Amino acid sequence: MSERGEFKTTYGAPMPPYETADDAYRAAVERLGAPGEPPFTRGVRPTMYRGRLWTMRQYAGFGSAEESNARYRYLLSQGQTGLSVAFDLPTQMGFDADDPRAEGEVGKVGVSISSIDDFALLLKDIPLDQVTTSMTINATAAILLGMYVAVAKRQGVPLTRVGGTTQNDILKEYIARGTYIYPPRQSMRLVTDVIAYCAEQLPRWNPISISGYHIREAGADAVQELAFTFANAIAYVGAAVERGLPVDAFAAQLSFFFAANATLIEEVAKFRAARRIWERIMRERFGASDPASLALRFHTQTMGSTLTAQQPRNNIVRTAIEALAAVLGGTQSLHTNAYDEALALPSEESARIALRTQQLIAEESGVAETVDPLGGAYLVEKLTADIETRTLAELDRIDAQGGALAGIERGYQQRAIEDSAYRYQREVETKARVIVGVNAFQTEGDETKITTLRVDESVAARQRERLVALRKRRDAARVGRLRADLRSAAEGTANLMPAIVAAVDGDVTLGEICADLRASFGAYVPPDRG
């Protein structure tokens, strides 16, 4: 009987009809190791989910700080175990809500934060010594972390008990997402300032979440996702070491963020290969010796780009498959997308279903009862080894460019992602890749009539009014001194975090801080790549 077609991985390798225990398989199994031990192929903890489930961390944020705070408290009441904050585009790009460049975007794709007042409202009645918070923020990460620190101090929480993560991965913004402000080398200074500050002041805070997720969503395949992410990670670790930080003093605080696609077996292999690659990088390139420095800890999010506006309830199934891949792959925390996200921000109902998807996997599927349940499977082990080999080869190519930063400046990673995205789209258009409800199994009068969340259009006006009131009541002379101190620090070489924390606590706004840093650092203009 003939086969249905040609079967390949997302990165173009042929998928065999079946696998056997040949020499390649036996070699792969010999390198496995035990869970919780280098090279961590089988997981970063000996008991994995038998000891503690992954953190269920739903990404949320919209409109005003008050509205987002209500959503966070609702999710926590429904069993969520950590917060994940989405910020609107003006906040990500360094503009206050009353800046003309923020017009039409305030509160639309995340929560609007311009000042410490907004941030205090965002975290109202949420005890920061009991809940960890992940903040998806990059160009303005140092400022938002400064606000978090200031609010924690106001709550009376010792910084040694404050836990969470700032994404703070600016390099991937230049190749995959675009929310950059300053040139790459000046941005790298801010990243390393945050790493150094956290190593000294915030021992439970992950100063960076090096993100393959956005690279994958931009069109990269599984191998490119790992290779470009690890190339960025090598650049960050190298920069921190050059600043005089011993690698074992901060490496255990590094975290990662990956995508989970619906290609379940390939994704499980990808996550397992990632742990093995990172252990090797830290041991061989940087001489790390603390096992905690060698262990890859990562958050996973199901892929937004796989969600369809057509037949949107199918997305519940897509997300469940992707979430299962993340769990089988040993993620430390997980966000499951809501089924309506191809149409709007998640409604309360869709957010609850997304959270329940994780809870069903955790409590009813049985996959959390055994560590690395797919370990030893012929296909899984050989795919793990194949992805590892191909990723290391791609890292060699990036090294030949001069590393991640030089590659970005030459456009190497950007071109590779664009080419991969084009190949994927051609497969969809030619139906070589089936997307249920999009290019196959369509229905007439698609069932897109679902209730979606709409952001209150008055949010922008209320945010502007709040800023007017802030500027009237604050101590203008103190604000002037704090901004002068920040500019002086930016012109020098000292860590900027103390000046930023002081500025936000003294009612200097996010937009004002970014304006001062733009004046010192300049603004990044991407090269014309023709």
In which residue ranges do the predicted regions lie?
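Short beta-alpha connecting loops at secondary-structure transitions
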Residues: E103-K108, K172-Y182, I215-A220, F258-T263, ...
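Generic, well-ordered alpha-helical scaffold segments in large soluble proteins
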Residues: F62, R71-Q78, I116-I126, M147-V151, ...
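Flexible glycine/proline-rich, aromatic-decorated loop/lid segments
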Residues: P246-F250, A288-T302, Q310-N337, P346-V371, ...
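Catalytic or ion-translocation cores adjacent to nucleophile or general acid/base/metal-coordination motifs
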Residues: L159, L190, L345, P527-G530
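Electropositive phosphate-/nucleotide-binding environments in soluble metabolic enzymes
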Residues: E66-N69, I113-I116, A142, R185-T192, ...
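Flexible, glycine-rich loop/tail regions that form catalytic "lids" or insertion modules at the edges
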Residues: G5-P17, A21-A24, E37-F40, L89, ...
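Phosphate/diphosphate-binding loops
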Residues: S114, T132, I137-T140, A152-R154, ...
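Catalytic alpha/beta active-site cores
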Residues: M1-N261, E266, R285, A292-H299, ...
